[in-house]
Amino acid sequence: MDFSTNGSEESELYHAQIHLYKHIYNFVSSMALKSAVELGIADAIHNHGKPMTLPELASSLKLHPSKVNILYRFLRLLTHNGFFAKTTVKSNGEEEETAYVLTPSSKLLVSGKSTCLSSVVKGALHPISLDLWGVSKKWFHEDKEQTLFECATGENYWDFLNKDSDYLSIFQDAMAADSRLFKLAIQENKHVFEGLESLVDVAGGTGGVAKLIHEAFPHIKCTVFDQPQVVGNLTGNENLNFVSGDMFKSVPSADAVLLKWVLHDWNDELSLKILKKSKEAISHKGKDGKVIIIDISIDDNSDDHGLTELQLEYDVVMLTMFLGKERTKKEWEKLIYDAGFSRYKITPICGFKSLIEVYP
């Protein structure tokens, strides 16, 4: 198109340029956020107990004086993006001075809080998560069924995870942090768990979600089912135990099977196997058993552009890391019915996820 012919086309060119450049440099906002987490900016403001001026913040973070203006410019971007907010305070000379406070988003970065998601930031923006994109062109042209992660590192994600103790710790912390937010979903959807006497949390990690369910419903006997290297050394109690095994071979019997952040790691063929094994695990309950899926359900018709963008970004992450996928309602329906289930119900939870109840 010749953009130089009239003002309308010039305007279109300028808007297209802004759109392009914005997406090119989106990574700067992400990395500035990572820097804020690593520096502990949210912790410093929280611990200060009141709005914090730039000199106070720089002093608390023990920054070199030459970096104060750099901190200001990072904060300017992060404030624009909604992670911090500005207010004014009176200094000793009674002059007003700019100070920073937390916003709902940065409150999610305060260490020690049950809602802290700092480990998610560290995991998602870890060098290993970013460096793999350097071989994306090679990955597209190779005639191999492998993930972008495998193309970049020569091994699959899970093998890498189990060999790198530092990264494994970040991953487990991130999963635990995400699970703690699940407490809100439990409170809002108690009916999902009422009437159950037993539940198995498949690929339940160190048991964060199972513990939340057990706290809310002490009568439910919860089993955390995961790989030996994950649960082998964990100790449970009368109503919370840990079992190791392979979910592609069998799942422990229970009234309900929980699959939280599991099926999006796998393609349809392997997800179908997991669902069929889960169906076998609840077979003793007849029509009263259920499988509870916590995952994303993409709404193609959503008016919330930001929400859909986040869900589609998650889909590409699952693709490049695991050859997994985030699914639309229609894709969930096909997968569920192909596994032999008769009905399902989808309930949006936690902002961008869904709770899917699946019945035999």
From Swiss-Prot:
What EC number is given for this enzyme? 2.1.1.270
**Residues spanning the membrane:** none
Upregulation details from the record are: Up-regulated by copper.
Does the keyword section mention Transferase? yes
Please cite one Gene Ontology biological process associated with this protein. methylation
Give the Gene Ontology MF terms in alphabetical order: 6a-hydroxymaackiain-3-O-methyltransferase activity; O-methyltransferase activity; protein dimerization activity; S-adenosylmethionine-dependent methyltransferase activity
The answer on whether this UniProt entry bears the keyword Transferase reads yes
Q: What class of enzyme is it?
A: transferase
Binding positions (S-adenosyl-L-methionine): V202, A203, G204, G205, D226, Q227, D246, M247, K260
Where, by residue number, is the active site?
A: H264 (proton acceptor)
Enumerate the SUPFAM superfamilies for this protein. Answer: S-adenosyl-L-methionine-dependent methyltransferases, Winged helix' DNA-binding domain
Q: Which InterPro entries match?
A: COMT-like, O_MeTrfase_dom, Plant_O-MeTrfase_dimerisation, SAM-dependent_MTases_sf, WH-like_DNA-bd_sf, WH_DNA-bd_sf
Family according to the record: Belongs to the class I-like SAM-binding methyltransferase superfamily. Cation-independent O-methyltransferase family. COMT subfamily.
Q: What does this protein do?
A: 3-O-methyltransferase involved in the phytoalexin pisatin biosynthesis. Can use (+)-6a-hydroxymaackiain, (+)-maackiain and with a lower activity (+)-medicarpin and 2,7,4'-trihydroxyisoflavanone as substrates, but not (-)-6a-hydroxymaackiain, daidzein, formononetin or isoliquiritigenin.
Under what name is this protein listed? Answer: (+)-6a-hydroxymaackiain 3-O-methyltransferase 2
Natural source organism: Pisum sativum (Garden pea)
